[in-house]
């Protein structure tokens, strides 16, 4: 009999360990019922908690599983402790029972004769087994028991609370005591005497709740119970023990009624009731000792709950009842199942032995299996239960850590790699202020930078140089490290189920956009958005690798990297992806970040990384960093034969919600997260031997984190044993705080520690340890490694580590991982020869890859060659530049690799035009072995299985097995029957063809030689494999039956048919095969062959007799022909070939479905094999070519020689098998040769049969050909930003003051409304607003038309500046005369173009401000009303007009002499003279169409880029102006005329516009009707030939009266005219008008700086300013090499245009090169397409790169159409 006892006590084992073990087992596929029960039990309790009153609900914190209750001591000792422990006990017992049944499937199967019993709450657990008709019912019935236990516990608490309320500040007191060695009747009599009826309330009486022969349990409210025990002499003298009963009274009939039972059971939502479950196993009542008579689940539950509430326990009755039952059944064996040893079970065991001595009784504990059977290496239950394997890592970390090995060297040596901020980020000399008083400056000079972060291989990643320069370097390096991590992980797309492109996602952490904000922002270009916005980082990785899974960019501040990894883990656990590429990125270039973090007191000012845990820790040191990892589910990684660097067991993120501020850490929340992650991972915190801390080196952060870590991993309550030391470390002390990459850096550090079996020394403590830390490190067994410490592997146990990572925004992320599994090879790879391949995208990288591999082999001479071959072929991407070699020895390989270095320059790319054509040639019988011993048959299961399938077909058709001729069971010279020999040949060839197909080698055309035609017809789809076997077998049988074996023979002669005829001397013979120009086979009788051999050899022709049984293709076969044709006619169906079929019978290529038939086979048996004419025909009709790759299918290469003799220039002809050579030697050589031709081989399939014997090697990563692509941040504009004098304090104070009213005393044509004015002492600010669509201003704009649009000319800006400058000066100095004003440093970053629809306003505002008018400066800025970003800036410098005139006097003579010179040149015809109409007509046709009011130039003389003009200003001034724009333009736009109309400029392709000037000043007013003379000479700048500078001198009566100095023009491709000068549409206008009210102009009076100087314009556009600092400017295309394209051809021009736009060289534009390889994407394609149309007249769509993906495609299209 089976008896299961459910105790009312927890097992003696640690409850944490029990629950943790159950949790871990539930993750595995072998325990589905256990997992379901735990889920159902948790759901049931959550449902009950949800239903609780609010005051009780508050007592239970949120939980995700019941394991958290075990760890919550406060909860288990709280008010609801009875309910909590009741649930935990039932869950432990039912889960242990279910898990035991699942792990011991042979036990506890038949419970029909079993019995159940329990004590206390254990009785409720027994109902789960009783109600389970089948094991599948256990989870639901068990969840019901858990639900009722909770409900009953809550109910008991509610009742008991009314009897005696508990003081939570005190320890809980017991409600029950067991009194030993007393008679129950005497005990009851004593209780009655002490509690007379009517004198003591019934509800307060002490009562007996359990009875045994020698003891009683007495229960009562704690104080009543304590008082009686102390008061009553009887109980005081007896020995009593307090029981751990703290939840209230049970077994109390005077307290509870049937209504209580009904409330608990009937009010519950029960699965058993819903499913109609009934008791099937008897449960013994602890009051009657008999099984309950319940018929339904509800009745059983009510019986049990009623007994627990109202009936006293009498275990002796249970024992008697069970013994009686055993006696009645006459059982001979009894197994007592329990959950740990207990007194009641021992009593039952004694009773059995006493009353039934013949009964064999055994005890079985259902708990130990949890610990004895650690989770087996079985698949997890689902993705959510999987462990996650890290299979590849790569990094770019500070200190030159470009590899993980170099990173480890930094850690191992204990280096601090902080240094002065490098110049490629910003000029620290101008951006540093140790006092912190200077605006926007950093108080630290130090960081931990990556060396040369701009290094990048743009062509490899299909980026043009122009795009690469713009793309954020952290995105570029994320792409590079992702490639390296995948490469080290052995990733090849679609190789396995887990590497399907649709199932791979990317997840990267990034918290800053420095490069976009500062470097890119200086010149916004086509790639500004895709090159800088964060989403494009992971998106670019997906796009490059063609991953179709999700891509996420994660920003959680400093925890971004690890949070991204955690989200990647979630995706794997959720089943969203099968492989995740993840990590973090951070490249620092923006000085604002340093200034802001300094102001927030985050950064250390010293020259150190991070002083983590140091007493003087004062903040962190900022750091660069890029880290990438590849993560899979563990079972997938193991199935894929990956290297497993570490295994992630759990990860989670939460928020420090209760912290004192958002940036302040919180130890409690950190500890909570750690416990939660450990619980989910099923890990005991004390088993974790290393924790990598965040450790930024801030006082607050270090203390809070250390407190949380100690609380969880090294607590005082449950201390670590001596053999459980815990070490802690923090990588930031070495490489600084990488912010968004910090967690990634920490994870990679831990992975390297696992690999190196060492804990590197901690270098953060520079003085002494933080005094706030607890002093009991030693007692806690907690250690900081001050020297490198061994971290050895422990047999039978895995090392565990945790990583803490926090974010300044309040986020906490924690991860727990263990070391990867150790995998041993099952057996050695049997192959003797292997292929090692090295490839790259360029020759330079190929050289680098070869050199790296040579260095690796020299450093690792014991490298397993099989592993190397596997890694370099099946586990690496194969690029277009290749070397591959078959070898059997590493030393030999090293020599071959070294030799190949000298040949790299001669190696061209393969596969650029697609893979080569493949042809299969099938060998005839002349090459077959008598008895083959095929290693392929021995070693390749798929080949062997296919041979067996074919052999089965043959035997089913009545033929003998051909296996003995293949498997080596006979000596090679053993001669089999013709049937076996011929079947062996055809089966081998069909199996070889299928094997080649599995390797990716499939024929495009076939030819068969003699008997090889049957296999060829099968592969071509003409006949089935079954028919091929039938045809060959029947033909062989007929030959055997009707022809005499060995009476005839065949002889190969190295001569042509004509030569044989000429030299045979008339000897009789039959031409059997014409194989080549000098290869012929004769057939005949042996005598005939002997006779003809003599003259042929005498003539010098080599003759070889073939070892064949019959003379095929001769008269010997005549007897079988009729029968053969008849049999095939009726038994074989011939289909149309699926590929060209080269017929050696007909000497031509067959495409139709009629030629190949039974008659064809008859003729092919008898007639000659015309291999030579067949091949010649195939060449003639281009069915094959010299580029065709030939694979010979047969036991020995024969046809390959014929093919090469017919087509000597054949690229490749290789064998499958070679006689007397190991198959793998032949296959390796052939595979290597095929690989070098570009055939897409399935290397994975090639190695798959041996993968258990192979391991992935960590070979050197790809040798990128890197260049430095970097946009340098220039100047110090980050310090100014146009708000240099902004004062937050003043702004706040002024906001509370009444705003001054703005007077309306200023209104001109350009300054329509003053909207803000404030003056304070010598400081002031004025803001105006004007509508471009109004009045004279609109007329002025439309008088200056470009591209058909009205454009606000710079002269309008000048009038506004002079107007506001005069106005502001008068307001500040009303009594002073307004001085002359020099408008300096005008910079227009974006033209203001008038919209077409004038009914909508187009408003802009201009601000003029000065901190101190005595400084002589007024700052100007122009903005649209809906945008605070200025589109123009300038500075007015106050001056003296007389001083200007004096300074110009010396120049007047020089200018006049140049004008005289131009006059002479014009007179001599050496300079051009233009009239007014000619000049403005030309100006209008080239760029600017001026209205008549602007047309002041009356004549122009121009030579090259030098000119003068006679100017007369219009006599009518329409509008109100300070200086009319018509006047300014008339005297100044000579410079624009020169730049756009001079023959020295290419006006057809380009146009020139001015972004501004250095100065504009007029010493005298410009007067209507007055005459002036303007002179200018423009010169190109040295730094940028597209930028020109010049000075425009304005003269009156030979005296300089005005000057526009340093006027700048920049040349742009005319194709961009539409982009920059197009009227804004209505939608934009409406949006601007609608948003105008939301933007409030700042009118804060500027604060005077300590030293006033002309400020740099805010955020200048480098495109317009001409100020560029690019280490790698786009290269100009070099002269193309000699080609068939003439210089003036459309093709040549098109290539030049492409090279120019892509920043490429023409030599890069080979026909086989794709646009994608050049990095020309859709954006650049649009620009190129537009230029094709406008400059070349070539009409192409914007999808150029899609329509013509390769240069050659585009060239051919141009040749055809242009």
From Swiss-Prot:
The active site is at 558 (for beta-ketoacyl synthase activity), 694 (for beta-ketoacyl synthase activity), 737 (for beta-ketoacyl synthase activity), 1344 (proton acceptor), 1529 (proton donor). Residues 1632-1689 are annotated as: Disordered. Keywords: Multifunctional enzyme, Phosphopantetheine, Phosphoprotein, Transferase. GO terms for biological process: fatty acid biosynthetic process; secondary metabolite biosynthetic process. This is Non-reducing polyketide synthase PKS8-1. The modification O-(pantetheine 4'-phosphoryl)serine is found at residue 1722. Gene3D superfamilies: 3.30.70.3290, 3.40.47.10, ACP-like (1.10.1200.10), Malonyl-Coenzyme A Acyl Carrier Protein, domain 2 (3.40.366.10), Polyketide synthase dehydratase (3.10.129.110). Non-reducing polyketide synthase; part of the gene cluster that mediates the biosynthesis of an emodin derivative that may be involved in black Sigatoka disease of banana. The pathway begins with the synthesis of atrochrysone thioester by the polyketide synthase PKS8-1. The atrochrysone carboxyl ACP thioesterase MYCFIDRAFT_190111 then breaks the thioester bond and releases the atrochrysone carboxylic acid from PKS8-1. Its EC number is 2.3.1.-. It comes from Pseudocercospora fijiensis (strain CIRAD86) (Black leaf streak disease fungus). The keyword Transferase applies.
């Amino acid at each position: 009999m089976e008896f299961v006892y459910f105790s009312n006590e927890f097992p003696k084992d640690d409850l944490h360990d029990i629950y943790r073990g159950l949790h871990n087992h539930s993750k595995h596929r072998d325990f589905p019922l256990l997992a379901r029960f735990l889920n159902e039990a948790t759901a049931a309790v959550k449902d009950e908690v949800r239903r609780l009153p609010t005051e009780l609900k508050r007592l239970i914190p949120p939980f995700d599983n019941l394991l958290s209750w075990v760890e919550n001591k406060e909860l288990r000792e709280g008010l609801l402790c009875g309910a909590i422990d009741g649930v935990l006990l039932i869950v432990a017992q039912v889960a242990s029972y279910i898990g035991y049944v699942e792990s011991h499937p042979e036990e506890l199967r038949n419970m029909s004769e079993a019995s159940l019993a329990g004590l206390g709450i254990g009785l409720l657990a027994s109902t789960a087994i009783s109600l389970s008709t089948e094991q599948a019912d256990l989870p639901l019935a068990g969840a019901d028991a858990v639900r009722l236990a909770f409900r009953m516990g809550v109910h008991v608490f509610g009742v008991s609370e009314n009897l005696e309320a508990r003081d939570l500040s005190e320890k809980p007191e017991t409600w029950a005591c067991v009194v030993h060695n007393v008679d129950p009747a005497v005990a009851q009599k004593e209780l009655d005497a002490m509690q007379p009826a009517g004198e003591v309330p019934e509800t307060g009486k002490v009562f007996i709740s359990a009875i045994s022969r020698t003891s009683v349990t007495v229960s009562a409210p704690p104080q009543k119970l304590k008082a009686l025990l102390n008061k009553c002499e009887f109980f005081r003298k007896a020995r009593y023990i307090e029981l751990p009963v703290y939840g209230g009274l049970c077994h109390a009939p005077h307290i509870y009624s049937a209504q209580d039972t009904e409330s608990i059971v009937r009010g519950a939502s029960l699965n058993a009731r819903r499913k109609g479950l009934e008791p099937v196993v008897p449960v013994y009542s602890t009051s009657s000792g008999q099984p309950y008579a319940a018929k339904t689940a509800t009745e059983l539950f009510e019986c049990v709950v009623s007994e627990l509430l109202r009936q006293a326990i009498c275990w002796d009755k249970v024992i008697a009842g069970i013994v009686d039952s055993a006696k009645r059944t006459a059982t001979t064996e009894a197994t007592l199942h329990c959950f740990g040893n207990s007194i009641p079970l021992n009593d039952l065991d004694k009773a059995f032995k006493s009353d039934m001595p013949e009964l064999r009784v055994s005890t079985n504990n259902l708990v130990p299996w949890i610990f004895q059977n650690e989770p087996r290496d079985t698949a997890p239950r689902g993705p959510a239960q999987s462990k996650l394997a890290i299979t590849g890592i790569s990094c770019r970390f500070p200190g030159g850590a470009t590899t993980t090995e170099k990173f480890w060297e930094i850690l191992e040596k204990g280096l601090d790699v902080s240094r002065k901020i490098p110049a490629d980020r910003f000029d620290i000399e101008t951006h540093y202020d140790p006092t912190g008083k200077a605006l926007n400056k950093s108080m630290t000079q130090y960081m931990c930078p990556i060396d040369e972060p701009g290094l990048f291989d743009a062509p490899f990643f299909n980026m043009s140089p122009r795009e690469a320069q713009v793309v954020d370097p952290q995105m570029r390096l994320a792409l590079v490290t992702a490639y390296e991590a995948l490469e080290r992980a052995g990733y090849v797309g679609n190789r396995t189920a887990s590497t399907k492109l649709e199932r791979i996602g990317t997840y990267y952490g990034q918290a800053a956009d420095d490069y976009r904000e500062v470097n890119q922002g200086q010149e916004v270009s086509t790639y500004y958005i895709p090159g800088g916005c964060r989403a494009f980082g992971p998106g670019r990785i997906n796009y490059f690798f063609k991953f179709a899974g999700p891509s996420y960019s994660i920003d959680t501040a400093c925890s971004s990297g690890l949070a991204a990894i955690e989200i990647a883990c979630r995706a794997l656990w959720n089943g969203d992806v099968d492989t995740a590429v993840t990590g973090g990125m951070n490249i620092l270039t923006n000085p604002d970040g340093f200034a802001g973090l300094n102001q927030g007191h985050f950064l250390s000012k010293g020259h150190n990384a991070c002083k983590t845990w140091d007493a003087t820790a004062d903040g962190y040191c900022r750091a660069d960093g890029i880290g990438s990892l590849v993560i899979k589910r563990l079972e997938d990684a193991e199935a894929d034969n990956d290297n497993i660097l570490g295994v992630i067991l759990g990860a989670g993120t939460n928020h420090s919600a209760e912290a004192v501020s958002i940036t302040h850490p919180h130890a409690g929340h950190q500890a909570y997260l750690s416990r939660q992650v450990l619980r989910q991972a099923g890990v005991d915190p004390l088993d974790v031997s290393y924790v990598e801390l965040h450790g930024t080196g801030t006082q607050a952060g270090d203390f809070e984190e250390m407190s949380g870590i100690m609380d969880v991993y090294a607590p005082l309550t449950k201390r670590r044993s001596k053999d459980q030391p815990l070490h802690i470390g923090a990588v930031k002390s070495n490489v600084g705080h990488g912010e968004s990459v910090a967690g990634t850096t920490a994870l990679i550090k831990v992975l390297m520690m696992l690999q190196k079996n060492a804990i590197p020394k901690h270098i953060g403590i520079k003085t002494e340890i933080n005094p706030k830390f607890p002093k009991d490190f030693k007692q806690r067994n907690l250690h900081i490694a001050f020297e490198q410490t061994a971290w050895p592997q422990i047999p039978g146990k895995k090392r565990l580590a945790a990583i803490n990572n926090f974010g300044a925004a309040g986020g906490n992320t924690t991860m727990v991982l263990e070391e990867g599994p150790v995998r041993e090879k099952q057996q050695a790879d049997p192959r003797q020869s292997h292929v090692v391949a090295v490839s790259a995208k360029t020759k330079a990288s190929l050289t680098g890859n070869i050199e790296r591999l040579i260095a690796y082999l020299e450093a690792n001479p014991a490298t397993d060659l099989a592993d190397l071959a596997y890694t370099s072929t099946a586990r690496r991407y194969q690029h277009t530049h290749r070397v591959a070699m078959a070898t059997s020895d590493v030393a030999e390989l090293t020599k071959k690799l070294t030799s190949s270095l000298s040949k790299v320059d001669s190696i061209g790319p393969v596969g650029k035009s697609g893979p080569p054509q493949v042809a299969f040639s099938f060998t005839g019988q002349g090459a077959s072995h008598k008895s083959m011993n095929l290693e392929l048959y021995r070693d390749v299961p798929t080949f062997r299985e296919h041979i067996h399938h074919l052999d089965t077909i043959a035997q089913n058709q009545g033929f003998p097995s051909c296996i003995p001729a293949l498997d080596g069971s006979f000596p090679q010279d053993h001669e089999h029957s013709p049937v076996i020999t011929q079947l062996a040949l055809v089966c081998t060839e069909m199996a070889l063809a299928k094997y080649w197909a599995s390797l990716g080698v499939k024929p495009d055309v076939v030819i068969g030689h003699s008997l090889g035609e049957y296999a060829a017809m099968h592969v071509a789809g003409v006949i089935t494999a079954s028919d091929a076997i039938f045809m060959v077998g029947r033909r062989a049988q007929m030959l055997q039956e009707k022809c005499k074996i060995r009476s005839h023979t065949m002889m190969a002669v190295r001569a042509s048919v004509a030569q044989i005829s000429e030299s045979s001397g008339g000897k009789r013979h039959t031409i059997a095969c014409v194989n080549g120009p000098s290869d012929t086979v004769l057939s005949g009788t042996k005598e005939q062959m002997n006779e003809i051999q003599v003259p042929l050899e005498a003539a010098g022709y080599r003759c070889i007799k073939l070892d064949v049984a019959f003379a095929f293709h001769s008269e010997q076969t005549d007897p079988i022909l009729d029968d053969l044709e008849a049999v095939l006619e009726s038994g074989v169906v011939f289909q149309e070939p699926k590929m060209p079929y080269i017929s050696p019978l007909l000497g031509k290529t067959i495409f139709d479905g009629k030629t190949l038939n039974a008659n064809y086979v008859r003729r092919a048996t008898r007639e000659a094999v015309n291999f030579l004419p067949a091949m010649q025909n195939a060449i003639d009709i281009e069915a094959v070519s010299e580029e065709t790759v030939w694979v010979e299918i047969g036991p020995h290469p024969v046809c390959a020689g014929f093919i090469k003799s017919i087509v000597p220039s054949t690229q490749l002809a290789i064998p499958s098998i070679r006689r007397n050579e190991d198959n793998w030697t032949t296959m390796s050589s052939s595979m290597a040769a095929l690989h070098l031709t570009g055939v897409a081989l399935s290397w994975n399939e090639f190695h798959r049969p041996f993968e258990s014997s192979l391991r992935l090697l960590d070979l050197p990563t790809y040798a990128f050909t890197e260049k430095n692509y970097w946009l340098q941040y220039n100047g110090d504009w980050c310090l100014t930003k146009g708000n240099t004098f902004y004062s937050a304090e003043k702004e706040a104070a002024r906001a509370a003051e009444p705003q001054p009213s703005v007077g309306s005393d200023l209104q001109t044509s350009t300054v329509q409304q003053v909207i803000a004015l404030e003056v304070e002492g010598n400081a002031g600010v004025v803001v105006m607003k004007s509508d471009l669509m109004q009045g004279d201003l609109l007329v002025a704009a439309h008088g200056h038309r470009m591209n058909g649009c009205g454009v606000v000319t710079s002269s309008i800006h000048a009038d506004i500046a002079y107007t506001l400058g005069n106005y502001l000066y008068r307001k500040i100095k009303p009594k002073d005369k307004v001085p002359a004003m020099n408008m300096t440093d005008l910079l227009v970053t974006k033209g203001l173009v008038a919209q077409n629809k004038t009914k909508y306003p187009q408003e802009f505002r201009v601000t003029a401000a000065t901190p101190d008018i005595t400084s002589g400066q007024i700052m100007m800025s122009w903005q649209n009303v809906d945008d605070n970003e200025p589109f123009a800036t300038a500075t007015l410098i106050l001056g003296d007009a007389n001083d200007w005139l004096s300074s110009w006097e010396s120049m007047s003579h020089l200018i006049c002499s140049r004008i005289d010179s131009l006059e002479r040149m014009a007179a001599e015809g050496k300079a051009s003279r233009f009239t007014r109409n000619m000049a403005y007509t030309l100006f209008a046709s080239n760029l600017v169409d001026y209205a008549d009011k602007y047309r002041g130039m009356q004549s122009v003389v121009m030579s090259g880029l030098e000119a003068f003009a006679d100017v007369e200003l219009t006599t009518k001034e329409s509008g109100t102006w300070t200086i009319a724009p018509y006047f300014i333009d008339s005297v100044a736009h000579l410079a624009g005329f020169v730049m756009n109309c001079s023959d020295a400029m290419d006006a057809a392709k380009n146009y020139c516009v001015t972004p501004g000037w250095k100065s504009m000043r007029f010493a005298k007013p410009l007067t209507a009707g007055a005459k002036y003379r303007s002179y200018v000479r423009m010169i190109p700048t040295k730094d940028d030939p597209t930028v020109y500078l010049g000075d425009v001198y304005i003269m009156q009566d030979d005296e300089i009266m005005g000057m526009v100095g340093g006027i700048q023009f920049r040349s742009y491709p005319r194709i961009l005219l539409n982009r920059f000068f197009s009227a804004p549409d209505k939608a934009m206008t409406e949006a601007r008008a609608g948003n105008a009210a939301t933007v409030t102009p700042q009118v804060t009076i500027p604060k005077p700086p300590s030293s006033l100087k002309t400020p740099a314009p805010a955020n200048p556009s480098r495109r317009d300013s001409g100020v560029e600092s690019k280490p790698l400017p786009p290269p100009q295309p070099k002269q193309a090499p000699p080609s068939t394209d003439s210089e003036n051809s459309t093709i040549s021009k098109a290539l030049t245009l492409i090279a120019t736009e892509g920043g490429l060289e023409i030599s890069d534009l080979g026909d086989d090169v794709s646009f994608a390889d050049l990095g020309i994407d859709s954006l650049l394609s649009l620009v190129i397409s537009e230029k094709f149309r406008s400059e070349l007249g070539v009409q192409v769509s914007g999808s150029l790169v899609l329509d013509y993906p390769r240069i050659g495609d585009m060239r051919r299209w141009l040749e055809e159409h242009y």
